[in-house]
Structure formats: C-alpha cells, structure tokens
Amino acid sequence: MAEALACGGKRRIWGKNAKFGVKRSGICTIFTAENGTMTDFAAIDFETANEQPSSVCSVGVVIVRGGVMVDSFYSLIHPEPEYYQWFCRRVHGLGPEDTEDAPVFPDVWEKIAPKIEGLPLVAHNARFDEGCLKAVFRVYRMDDPGYLFHDTLAASRRHYGCRLPNHQLQTVAAVCGFDLTRHHHALADAEACAHIALKLL
C-alpha cells in the first residue's frame, strides 16, 4: 500500500496503485516498496558529444542474469554529428581527440546487440538513453527492435520520495550500496544503474 509522509504539515494517501512520489502544495508522498526482483536485464548508459541525441560518443552496458552481473561492455564511439559542445565535455571529459579513431555506432552496436538479445534495458533517466538509441538508429537507418526500457530514476522516486535530497544517479547509487567514483563514465554509470535496479526493480 502507498504510504504518505507530510512534508508541509499536510498528509495525503494516494493508494496502492500510485506510481510516483510528488511534491505539491507542501505535500510529499513516499511509497513503500512493492517491487518484485528483476533478475535478468541489461543496464545501459550513453554519453553524448553535443545537444543532438544521436551524438553518442561512448556507451556502457552491464548484463545481469539471475541477479548477477555476468558481462560488461564499453566503447568509445565516433559521434554523429561530429562535434563537441563545451558543456558535454565538461560533464564527461571526452573530446574529439578521444573519438577521432573510434568505431561508428553501427559497428559498436553489432557487438552489443547479441549480448542484450531478449533482455529488457534499464537506464537512469531512461527517456534520455532511449531517446539517444532511437535517434542514432534513425541517423544510420538501422532497424529499431523496440527495446523495452525500465527507469531507475522513476523507481527511486517511487521508493524513496522526499527521503533523498535528489534522485541523481550518484545519490541513489550510494543509498543502494554502490560507490560511484567515476560518474559520467558510461560503464561506471551502467554499473551503478545495475546495482540500483537489483535493489529497486
């Protein structure tokens, strides 16, 4: 059943089917965990070179089977379009000198696709990573298999609500027992996401 916590002097219960904890007019709703355990999935993280979602410049993937991380993959990617914006560089530290000789996305995805076949994908703020994947499929005119995405950001909001100062990846990872020391390295972020998913999904 959903559980409500008053953050502003009011109390409200939304019922067991409510999905998100939100803050409105001083009300912050927190939900108790009712999640089962997702034991088979692929956690994925993209970093981009610029504001275009197709401009993926690195990818990290962690394969989880039976609740155990059994495989991982990381690659730099030659971005499309091929330019870097300063705010992206400031986030992940990558630049054209890092990806000038990197493989293009189709060559990288050819290695990833067999690893994730039949698995749901998990990402933190899945709308971003799913958007990147769909955009780069369009750019290279690749078939989109329509991967099913699960979002650990949404799961954190459901489970922790206002008990956390924020629901950023490093914050949620720490609560779930993972020390994310290389935030915005795609593989480190995918590993953190996998740890969160094992706790919350």
Briefly describe each language-model feature range:
Residues 31-147, 162, 166-184:
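Conserved non-catalytic scaffold segment of RNase H-like nuclease domains
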Residues 143-157:
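Conserved beta-strand -> loop -> alpha-helix junction used to position metal-binding or nucleic-acid-contacting
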Residues 185-198:
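Acidic, divalent-metal-coordinating active-site segment for phosphoryl/phosphodiester hydrolysis
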Residues 19, 23-37:
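Short, Lys/Arg-enriched N-terminal segments with co-localized hydrophobic residues
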